[in-house]
Amino acid sequence: MPHGEKLYEGKAKILYATEDPTLVIQYFKDDATAFNAQKRGTIMDKGVCNNRISSALFTYLEGRGVRTHFVKQIDDRSMLVRRLTIVPLEVTIRNITAGGMAKLLGIEEGMVLKRPVFEWHYKSDALGDPLINDDHILTMDWATAEELAHIRSESFKVNDALKAFFNERQIDLVDFKLEFGRCPSRGTPPSAGSATGMPRPQAEAVSTTILLGDEISPDTMRLWEHGTRRKLDKDRFRRDLGSVEEAYQEVLRRVLGEAHQASGASR
């Protein structure tokens, strides 16, 4: 599918315009970053793995009532998605202690939590994606109370679905991050600036629908092999554990093993 001008290039993806102003092409790169881009590298075919994994998981979630920006997979590195105005927040859901939570609370990694922990983070590399709460968000007009309630509900729905999905594949879903965006309900596409993936300073007053955006991949999830706790995600890059490409390929193999059977065919 031919693409138009580059709208935005981030650390892991590029967004391109299409002939339809309501749709963009999301292209996955092999570039890898960690610690808010302080560490950089390349993971061979990471873009291919993440695009295919995300396509399968978005399709799976759509089949379970989660509305996403995903339209279809175009090729090995690209997917067609709805054009969103990204809410300047990242959601993190934690099922097992690891990473930032273990460091913040001074506890060991690997403790299974008695209930999932939900976190809001302000989407800002410069500030290190700080942990925030509802009051910060509402005071800064980053989202409305109704939007926050919807995002929270959808995030837990995603967690339930993905935990079941990966459990069947002998993988523990340790934690993951999600991003959401606004899709105009009246057929008017977002302005060019808002389609870049950069956050808006305020919530828009127009009628919109909140959709799950970005990607769902080993870049955005912590995945441990059940029983061994072997890391199958970007922590292998962050912590110089080696075998990074093999871990991504292993997740792809397990995801595609049954994803298409569960959802029919890839859209």
Model feature map: region roles:
Residues 93, 173-184, 208-214:
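Conserved metal-phosphate-binding beta-hairpin within the catalytic cores
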Residues 111-128, 159-172, 216-221:
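Phosphate-binding core of ATP-grasp and ATP-grasp-like enzymes
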Residues 72-77, 166-183:
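A short glycine-rich, hydrophobically flanked beta-strand micro-motif that places a catalytic Asp/Glu
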Residues 2-122, 255:
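Active-site loop/lid in soluble adenylation, ligation, and acyl-transfer enzymes
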Residues 189-204, 267:
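Short Gly/Ser/Thr- and charged-rich N-terminal loops/segments
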Residues 142-174:
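A long amphipathic alpha-helix within ATP-dependent nucleotide-binding catalytic cores
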Residues 216-260, 264-267:
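C-terminal helix-cap and adjacent tail motif
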Residues 38-48, 131-154:
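Short histidine-centered catalytic/ligand-binding loop motif
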